[in-house]
Amino acid sequence: MMAAKFFLHGVPDSPAIWGPLLAALNLGDAPVAVPAMPGFTGPLPAGFAATKEAYADWAVTEVERLAAAYGPVDLVGHDWGAIIVQRVAMIRPDLVRSWALSNAVIDPDYRGHRVARIWNTPLLGEIFMAISGPATLAKSLTDQGVPADIAAE
């Protein structure tokens, strides 16, 4: 059996972003986990801190479940999910067979793209999200080439 796979989406995505890639990969009977990060497809769970470390801890728990059943896991992360995947690989290398990243800039001088800087600004990020709404975010994603059905997710 092929190693288990763990795909982690970015911001403002959902697990739907992986659909076309998974179809193209034709992974057969390989166990595949494509979870939604807490708060991304529904309300943030009560008490969840929504910090990098909280998301990394959550991801470790998810990967531990896969590794317990299938052995070391192949991790794939995009954008914010890539940052979390890297953190999982750093703190729990015993769970990881391989890891691959997309759209993650790891450079101490990189400040993030314009929208990421807005999201990271207290109060401004919340206002931006309240004003933007799902339709505006979906349009932004389709303008960047994401299929409309996935962007609407």
Located regions from the model:
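Short beta-strand element of the alpha/beta-hydrolase
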Residues: 3-10
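Exposed regions on extracellular, virion, or secretory-pathway luminal proteins
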Residues: 2-3, 71
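Flexible "cap/lid" subdomain of the alpha/beta-hydrolase fold that forms the substrate-access gate
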Residues: 11-17, 25, 33, 38-76, ...
